[in-house]
């Protein structure tokens, strides 16, 4: 039987945690740690979960300061890379390539203000919360269990009476493909091991097979609907706009027709 939570969100170490949760249908809004991560292998990065916990418990007070950022150059995803020296976190998905740091920084602050406020409000409205960590498949790294205990203790005390559980997804290449091992470490901490390397030709070794990680979560956990009616309507409108844009459609009937034509081998515009 699936274990149901009021809120599920990822705490790294990379964006693959958020991707797995979203694909599993367990997260529908954006949170502050979805698309930022540590610089793996750098001094102090291995206590990443502790630092993120401290930021949440401080309610993100003064966490984004311009003097803490260092430009690292352009990223292959079309964004500029910036490293936050104090937080030991790298921002790979925010700054438009070639943009002025000073010019874009207020936009960054406002975006993360919304995400931080949203997360804190949802935590306060929730009784049972699940934190997900998805380790990178190419690194022999395991989130220290003492860091998990620290996170549960600090968050539970700060947001009492909310209950926080942690699930750790770890890539174990000694397991057969499709084999899954669940290890309840202690009350509130669960380790799930499987081989979730992405074996597609040319795949990025840092990225897991998101299909495997998302199915693993979806089969074990569920989440109640925590969005307001306004947020649901806005999300549906956004998804609808994406679908229409894909086929150059301006209304539902045009979208259905062009999608059908594309499926039949046409060019999606109604012309074979």
Place the predicted regions along the sequence by residue.
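Long acidic/polar interaction regions in large eukaryotic complex-forming proteins
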Residues: 64-115
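Structural alpha-beta junctions
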Residues: 28, 146-173, 185-190
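Well-ordered, non-membrane alpha-helical segments in soluble/globular domains
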Residues: 105-117, 141-157, 210-215
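Membrane-proximal basic amphipathic "stem/tether" segments
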Residues: 227-272
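Adenosine ribonucleotide-centric catalytic and binding domains
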Residues: 8-81
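Short loop/turn segments at strand-loop or loop-helix junctions that form parts
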Residues: 12-14, 85-96, 129-137, 171-172
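Short acidic, S/G/P-rich loop/turn micro-motifs used as interaction or catalytic elements
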Residues: 16, 102-108, 135-144, 174-175
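Polybasic, proline/glycine-rich intrinsically disordered low-complexity segments
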Residues: 167-233
